[in-house]
C-alpha cells in the first residue's frame, strides 16, 4: 500500500538521522510521488492518518537542535501536498515549527527558504483547489493573522530597540517577503489583517512599508483594497498625522493606488483635495497648518518621539537630546514632502473639479457638502498651485465635460488601465517627465526589467500542477554554521559601509523591508565598538540617537526609492506597451501596404473585368436585340399563323358545312336510289310476272291451238266465249306491257339521272379530299419550317417553349378533332346500317303486300295465277336489296372512308 510505504519512509528518514547524521530524502520523495500517482486528489482519511503519524513522530523525537529542526522542516515540506489542514493543524505547526524558526536570530537562509515554501503553499491557493473552499481559506486566514501579528511586534521592537536590530533583520526579511508576495495575490485579505493594527501609531510605518511594496509590485487585485477600510485609514493618516516619514509613506501609497481605483473614488476625491491643501500649506518653519479635532484618531507625531518612547533604557536627558535632534531636522524632512505628484495625478484624473477647488476651496466645499478641517491662505495656495499648473499641459476634459459631468461619467475609465492612467499623468506633466526617471543618488536606475516583472516560482500565483515536493531540497549541512555579517566580523569600517550599502540597495531593489538597510548602520556601530571598548553611556546614547536619525533618513530614502521604482516601472510598462503598439502599428502598416498592393492588383483586375463586362454587355445587348428581333419575327409569324389558323378554322367550318350539305344531299340521293331500286325491283318483279303470264298465255294459247286442232267441232257458243276471253286477255296483256315499258323507261331515266348526280357528288368529294390533303401538306410544311427555325436558334432558347407549347396545343386540338370526327363517322355508319336494315324490312313488307294486291283479281280468272303467286312469294324470300342498291351503298361507304 502507498500509505504504509510512506509511513515507513518517514520513520526511516528519522532513523538515518540518528544513526548516520546525514539523512537522504530521496526515498521519501519517491514514496510521495507514488502516493500522488495512486491518489491524485487529497484523501481525507489518509491525510488524517499522515497527520497522526507526524504528531507521533514529533512527540517521540526530541527536536532539540537545529539539525533535527531542519530535518523536520524538510520532511514537512515534502509531505505537505498530501495533507488536508485546518485551524488546529495550523496552530500546532505554528507552535512547533513556524514561530521557533522565525523567532530564531541565528537561523540559516536555506531554512527560511523552505519555511517560506511551506507558508506560500498554505497561503496562496486556487479558489478551485481540490480541498479548497472554506477549509483552506480558514487555514490561510489563521496563518496570515499570526504572521501579521509576529511581523508587527518584531517591526516595532526593531524600530524601538536599536541594540538588537541586526538579530531581527533576517526574521523580518523573511516575514516581509512572505507578506509582500501574499499581498500581491491577496491584497484584500492582507489589508484586512492590517486594519486593526494600523490604529496603533507605532505600527503604521511598518505596515505602510509592506503595503507600498505590495502596490509597487502591481498585483492583479489592487482595486479590492478600498473595500476593506484600509484605504480610509491611510487617508486619515494623511489628514491628521504629523510625522514627515509616515506622511511620505502614506503619500506614496495614495499615489500608487489612485491609478487602480480612479473610477471608484466618490467621496474620497474631496478628501484627496483636502490632503493636497494640507500638504501645500506646510511651512518648513511652523510645520503643518492648524486643524480641527481628529476624533478618535490617535495622531502619529514624529518618528523619534514615537519609537524612542518604546525603549526603557533611555533617560530624560537622552530623550531631550533626541528631541533636539528631531527639532533640528524637522524642517529638512518637511521640505522633502513633495506633493507635486499628487497635484499631477489629481489634475490628470479630475482637472475641472480640482482647479475649481483650488480657485475657491470654501465655495467648492459648501457646494459639495464636505468640510475643510485645515486653515489655509488662499494667496499662498494660488501661488504654489500656479507654479505647478504652469508645468502641466492643458487637459482635454476642459472641452468635453463640465464639473458635474466629470464626476458622474465613469465610462471614460473603462478604456484606461492603471498603466494608461500613469502615462496620462506623465504626459500632462511636461517638466517632470525627465526628472521622474532619475535615481535619488544622482545616477540612473538599472535598466533591467526583471525587477518590475511579476514574481515567478513559489512567489507567483500557483498553478494547478504546482507541487511543493518537486522543488529541489535546499537544506545545507555545514560543519560550523555561522551568520555572515555578524557583529564580530573583522572587516574595516569603509569596506563594511560600502558592502552593506550595496547589500541594502540590492535588498531594497528586491522588495524587502526597511530593516534590511539598517544592517549597515549596525555594522558601523560594531566596527566602532570593536575598536573602542571603553565608551561612556553618554556617547552610547548619542550614538543610538545618531543611528535612529540615520535610520529615519534611510526610511525616507527607501520610500523615495520605492516610489521612483514604481514610476520607473510604470514608465517601463508604458514603454513596453508603446513598443507593442508600435510593433502592432508596424504590422498594421505593413498589412496596410500589402492591402494597398492587393487593392491595386484588384483594381487592375477590376478594370480588365470591366472591359470584359462591357464587351459581354455589348454582345449581350446585340444578342438581346437579335432576340427582340426574333421575338418580333416569331410574334408576327405566330400572328400570321393565328390568322391562317382562323382562316383554316373558317375553311374548316365551311368545309364542314359543305360536307354536311353534301351528306344531306347524299342521304337524299341514297333515299332516291333506294326508291329507284325499290321501284326497279317492283318493275322487275312485274316484268317477271308478266313474262310468266306471257309464258302461261303462250302455253295456254298453244294449248288452245292444240285444243282447236283436236276439237274442231266444238259448238259455236263455246267457241264464241273462248274467243271473247282470249281477246280480253290479249287486250289486258298489251295494256299492261305498254304501261310497264313506260315505267321502265322512266325508271331508267331516273336511274341515269341519279347515277350522274352520284358521279358528280363523288367528283366533288374527291376534290374536297384533294383540297384537304393539299391544306394538310401546306400546314405540315409550315410547321416543319417553324420547327427547323426554332431548332436552329440555339441562342434564343426562351422562344422554343412558347412555340412548342403552341404547336403541341394545335396538335392536341387537331388530334381531338380527328378523334371526334372518327367517333361521329363510326356513329354515322352505325346509324346508316340501322337505317338500311329498317329500309330493307320496309321494302320487304311492301314487296310482300303489292303482289297480293295485284294478283288478287286474277286468282279466279285462270289456274296459272296460282303458280305466279307462288313465284312472287319465292321471290320475296330473296335478298332485300338488289345489285344496283348494294353497289350504291358500297360506293357511298367507300367515299366516307376516304373522306
Swiss-Prot record:
Instruction: Please name the Pfam families in this protein's record.
Output: Hamartin
The protein's assembly and partners: Interacts with tsc2.
Q: Which gene encodes it?
A: tsc1
Per UniProt, subcellular location reads as: Cytoplasm
GO cellular component term of the entry, any: TSC1-TSC2 complex
Q: Which UniProt keywords apply?
A: Coiled coil, Cytoplasm
Indicate whether Acyltransferase appears among the record's keywords: no
Q: Which GO terms describe its molecular function?
A: GTPase activator activity
Job of this protein: Together with tsc2, required for uptake of various amino acids from the environment and for proper conjugation. Involved in induction of gene expression of permeases and genes required for meiosis upon nitrogen starvation. May act as a GTPase-activating protein (GAP) for the small GTPase rhb1.
Query: What is this protein's record name?
Result: Tuberous sclerosis 1 protein homolog
Q: Supply the InterPro entries for this chain.
A: ARM-type_fold, Hamartin
Please give the residue ranges the record annotates as the region Disordered.
874-899
Instruction: Name residues in a coiled coil.
Output: 540-706, 737-847
Compositional bias per record (Polar residues), positions renumbered to this chain: 889-899
> In its UniProt record, which GO terms are filed under biological process?
negative regulation of G1/S transition of mitotic cell cycle; negative regulation of TOR signaling; negative regulation of TORC1 signaling; positive regulation of L-arginine import across plasma membrane; positive regulation of L-leucine import across plasma membrane; positive regulation of L-methionine import across plasma membrane; regulation of cell cycle
